[in-house]
Amino acid sequence: YDQHAYQVKQNYKVTYEDAQVVSILLTTYHYHAGSAHGMYNTKGLVYNKITGQRIPLYNYVKIANPQQIERGINSGILRFYSEGHKKADLLPNWNVEYVSDNYYLKGKGAIGLVYQPYELGPYSYGNTFVEFSPKAIEYFNRMNG
C-alpha cells in the first residue's frame, strides 16, 4: 500500500458535438488504500475539431469574479447542480472561491462550469456544476463586455 493508489478508474462522456466543436467530460477516480473514500476529478475539455486547439471559456462567457457566480446562483440566474444533475442549493458557509475555467458544453447554447468535490459542497454532492443558460450567458457578457 505505502501511499500508492489502490484503485484507479477513468471514463468519459461526450456532452456535445457538431461539425466544428467537441465537448468531453473526463473523470478520473482514485482510491488510496486506507482512505475513508475514493476521490475523483472531472475535467471538461472543449476542442475546435478543425484546428485541434482547446477553446477557452472566455470565448463563450465573460465572468469577472467568483462573487458574480455566487450571486447568480443565489438569485436563480444560474442553476446549481450536484452529481447526477440533481438541483442543489449552495449551502451556508460554502462560497464560490474562484471562477472555474473547467467547463463543458451542454448543447442548446448552455455551458456548465465544473467544480470538484468539496469545492462548492460536501462530498455527498460529488462534483458540482454551475449551469449558464443562453440568457445567463448573454447577461454575463453584457455585464462584463
Stretches with model-predicted labels:
Residues 1-145:
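Compositionally biased intrinsically disordered regions enriched in Thr/Gly
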